[in-house]
Amino acid sequence: ELFATAATGDQGRFLGTDPSYTQFDEDIIANLDLPFKVEFSGSEPATVAELDTRVAAKEPVLMYWWTPTAAVSKYDLVNVPLPNYSEECATHQAAKDGAVDCDYPEDVLLKYASSQLEEKAPEVYAFLQKFTMTNDDQLGLLPSAEIDKKPVDEVAKGWIDANTDVWKAWL
């Protein structure tokens, strides 16, 4: 009822983003028997605009989003837990059959380099092995660049100046 709209009737509104994205929102909602109807905004910018509108009006919104993004930091969005992702839950066949009923998989930072890098540039190879950038690290940077429109090099310099101990450990 809290999320219901005229278009969703007695069901809550679940804001989907671009329907061309790979997503299982409708399947997850149906398979978990949740009282929501998915309404797609049509694009990422339209979703952000809808989020801006809802937050400004102090209206609740339930939506699919991902992290790290500036919107997560700007609005301090919280994750609504779903059953944990598993390979079994989201197999190709489950997706094909509309049987997905779990959370999305976590994206992990993967670092790739030439197999010759360790030999040809051992200092670069060592740096890449030590380098880490967490979601929280990125969430601290994204709003400055994406929302406040600060130049990316200025945002990066600010992070470098404030995190000397972090990046020196990578060298």
Task: Please identify what each model-predicted range represents.
Residues F131-L171:
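C-terminal functional modules
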Residues A7-G9, A56-A57, S73, D103-P105, ...:
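Extracellular/periplasmic catalytic domains that process cell-envelope and extracellular macromolecules
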Residues L2-T5, D27-K37, A46, R54-P60, ...:
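Metal- and O2-centered redox machinery and metal/ROS homeostasis
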Residues A94-L110, A121-E123:
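Conserved, surface-exposed functional patches that form binding/active-site neighborhoods
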Residues E106-K120, L141-S144:
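A bilobed periplasmic-binding-protein/Venus flytrap-type ligand-binding module shared by bacterial periplasmic
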